[in-house]
């Protein structure tokens, strides 16, 4: 039985992870849970999974949480705030920490888990995008495993099993095209929040669904793939695959192409990251290629999706620039979801912020440099959105 700690337990990845634990109680047990502020979801999770320790990022609700579970025996340790989330990440005998926290808020807890010797099931891509120059050396220093738990990078990781070192030539990241794949470019000025949140294939949280609509999600995944698999940006490509059946592909040195296929279900990559190197038998719906039908591909429209080109440029710039891109995107998407900017303002504000930072970029940023760049970018987007 593998001991698991889950960060971001009340979000989309978190709830699906707990579905897996509930379905396979002989395979996994929960050591710790960390959540943001959703007590209505967290309290039933605590009662069902009986973690040893629980963190609530929103410190103001800690007393309410204590009162709600006062009848439990034994009582879990309750901690709060960002420091509490880091404490949970490093706690106890958990073998693997599933990082389902959205955004750069997952960076410090992931580092805490690595330093405590935990393997990381990485569903929080922002940790690598913003913190790659710091996180990767720590992974090597502490001898832990970094296992991708999002569909595309899990697909690449699975395809690479058995490929010798140096055998990888090219990565092909598939993208559904998001909510606006069939919209003309000139209609994007009329986009509403409801429009942006209608993902055609996947059930995900709001932020990542908007990222899919701008294709920034795929741009961020290009940077993540660079850090995870070591390929340069000229050998990482994006292709539109509307059916989301092929989750990504690799080309090896002899030009053979390997792909991983499955229904669009986030539980699959999460389960593989939790159970690797084992394969757990499930009763989930099996892929029927006749039912799936035609599998089609096309080149992404760069006029419709300017965030892709921007992400490639930022990735090549390196240093702290990816942290700026990520933070600017997080802030711009939050403003859009709060109805304070329009959809087309998202790429405009991100590009402006990255341009302003380019002269400040440093090639080998420290953790402090990355966190400072993150805060600077958020403030820049806020200020620019008011003009």
Curated annotation (Swiss-Prot):
Record-level GO BP terms: isopentenyl diphosphate biosynthetic process, methylerythritol 4-phosphate pathway involved in terpenoid biosynthetic process
Keyword Iron-sulfur: no
Binding site for 1-deoxy-D-xylulose 5-phosphate: 125, 151-152, 176, 199, 212, 217-218, 221
Keywords, in A-Z order: Isoprene biosynthesis, Manganese, Metal-binding, NADP, Oxidoreductase
Residues bound to Mn(2+): 150, 152, 221
Chain positions recorded as NADPH binding sites: 10-13, 36-37, 124, 126, 205
Xref: InterPro entries: DXP_reductoisomerase (IPR003821), DXP_reductoisomerase_C (IPR013644), DXP_reductoisomerase_N (IPR013512), DXPR_C (IPR026877), DXPR_C_sf (IPR036169), NAD(P)-bd_dom_sf (IPR036291)
Keyword Manganese: yes
Enzyme class of the recorded protein, top EC level: oxidoreductase
Recorded family membership: Belongs to the DXR family.
General function of this protein: Catalyzes the NADPH-dependent rearrangement and reduction of 1-deoxy-D-xylulose-5-phosphate (DXP) to 2-C-methyl-D-erythritol 4-phosphate (MEP).
HAMAP family, sorted: DXP_reductoisom
NCBIfam families, per database record: Dxr, PRK12464.1
PANTHER family xref list: 1-DEOXY-D-XYLULOSE 5-PHOSPHATE REDUCTOISOMERASE, 1-DEOXY-D-XYLULOSE 5-PHOSPHATE REDUCTOISOMERASE, CHLOROPLASTIC
Protein name per UniProt: 1-deoxy-D-xylulose 5-phosphate reductoisomerase
Organism: Cyanothece sp. (strain PCC 7425 / ATCC 29141)
Lineage: Bacteria, Bacillati, Cyanobacteriota, Cyanophyceae, Gomontiellales
């Amino acid at each position: 039985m593998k001991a698991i700690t889950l960060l971001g337990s009340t979000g989309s990845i978190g709830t699906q992870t707990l579905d897996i634990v509930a379905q396979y109680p002989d395979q996994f047990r929960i050591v710790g849970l960390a959540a943001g502020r959703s007590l209505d979801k967290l309290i039933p999770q605590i009662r069902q999974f009986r973690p040893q320790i629980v963190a609530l990022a929103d410190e103001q609700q800690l007393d309410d949480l204590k009162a709600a579970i006062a009848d439990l025996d034994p009582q879990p340790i309750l901690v709060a705030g960002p420091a509490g989330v880091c404490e949970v990440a490093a706690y106890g005998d958990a073998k693997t920490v599933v990082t389902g926290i959205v955004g750069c808020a997952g960076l410090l807890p992931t580092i805490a888990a690595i330093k405590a010797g935990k393997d990381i099931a990485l569903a929080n891509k922002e940790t690598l995008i913003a913190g790659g120059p710091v996180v990767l050396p720590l992974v090597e220093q502490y001898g832990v495993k970094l296992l991708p738990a999002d569909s595309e990078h899990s697909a690449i990781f699975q395809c690479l099993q058995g490929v010798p070192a140096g055998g990888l030539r090219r990565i092909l990241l598939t993208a559904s095209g998001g909510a606006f794949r069939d919209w003309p470019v000139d209609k994007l000025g009329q986009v509403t929040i409801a429009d942006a949140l209608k993902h055609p294939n996947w059930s995900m949280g709001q932020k990542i669904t908007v990222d899919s609509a701008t294709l920034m999600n795929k741009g961020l995944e290009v940077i993540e793939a660079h850090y995870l698999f070591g390929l340069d940006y000229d050998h990482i490509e994006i292709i539109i695959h509307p059916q989301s059946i092929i989750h990504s592909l690799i080309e090896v040195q002899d030009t053979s192409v390997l792909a991983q296929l499955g229904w669009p279900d986030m539980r699959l990559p999460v389960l593989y990251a939790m159970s690797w190197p084992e394969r757990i038998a499930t009763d989930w719906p099996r892929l029927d290629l006749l039912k799936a039908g035609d599998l089609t591909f096309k080149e992404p429209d760069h006029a419709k999706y300017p965030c892709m080109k921007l992400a490639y440029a930022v990735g090549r710039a390196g240093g702290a620039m990816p942290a700026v891109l990520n933070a600017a995107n997080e802030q711009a998407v939050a403003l859009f979801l709060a109805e304070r900017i329009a959809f087309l303002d998202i790429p405009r504000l991100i590009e402006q912020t990255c341009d302003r930072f380019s002269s400040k970029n440093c090639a080998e940023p420290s953790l402090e440099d990355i966190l400072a760049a993150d805060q600077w970018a958020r403030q820049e987007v806020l200020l620019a959105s008011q003009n």
